[in-house]
Structure formats: C-alpha cells, structure tokens
Amino acid sequence: EYPYTRSTRPNGHRSDFWTMTQVTGFGRGEEWSRRARYMLDQGLSGLILEYDLATTNGYDSDDPMVEGEVGRAGMALDSLEDLEAAFDLPFDKLKYLMSVCNAPQPVNLAMVIAALEKKGVDPQDFVLHIVNGILIEYTCVGRYIYPPEHGLRIATDCIEYIIRNHPNW
C-alpha cells in the first residue's frame, strides 16, 4: 500500500532486475549514441550521460577558453541537435537514463525532454535521473557558475518542475 517504504514500486526491487549502468561520455552526440547502443546491446539497461567540462561550465564548444577540452571528459552539448543525435537509441531497451550536467542542468533538463519528445519517446516510459549538483561544484570542485543562493534556487526550481510534471523520476 502506498506510500511504499522500500521503493517506488509495491514489491520494491524484488519485482525487477537491477538496472545495469555504466558512465560514458565523449565526443559529439553521434559518437555517444554509437557507444550507448553498443552498451545496450551488451545487456546494460541504463545509461549515464556525462558532459564535457565546456558544457558543465556553460561554454559553447567554439569558445577559445575550452580549446582542446571539447568532448574529452564527456559529451559536448551545444544545441538540441546534439541531444537528438545522442538519443538515436533503442528506447525500448532503456529503463534508466542519468544526465550529469550540474550548473547548466535547467537548460539540459529542458533539452532532454524536448529531444525525447521529438523522437516520439514519452519521458514517463523510463526513469530519468538528473544530477543537479550545484553545491558539488561550489564545495568540491572549486568552480561554479552561480553563487550558492542562486544555484540552490535554480536547483529547487528543477526539483519542483519534476515533482509536478514527472513524478515517476
């Protein structure tokens, strides 16, 4: 009976296999998509999309400040078209998608939802987990785009949107 105490489902994790995931992210959307399809073909049921430092710091790939860093430690994301290319996936095999973007997360969240909808995929069909790590950047990484009070407001706005519009996430 709701509210469940061990999971979001009545039988907890006993009713389903664990979601197998692996972190990946490099290059552009097409390259990430090829790697993601390969991982799904190998039996993974979840994907963790990591973005490059240019993206997580709010830079476009053509900015001179990030020359040599684009696509190295994650996928470069400059536009909705990048995510559309990345999401050329067999979504029927995918149960879980994590998007790690931190400070630009509000924009990334909107782009992920828009790219899924353009692909004809209902975001409610699987679990989307976003890493909304504003404080991680401020306290652990030592770089940040927003001061903590503004970053927390933006992060809680994302949480409120998800609670209202995508409660199964």
Residues covered by each model-derived region:
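Catalytic alpha/beta active-site cores
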Residues: 1-169
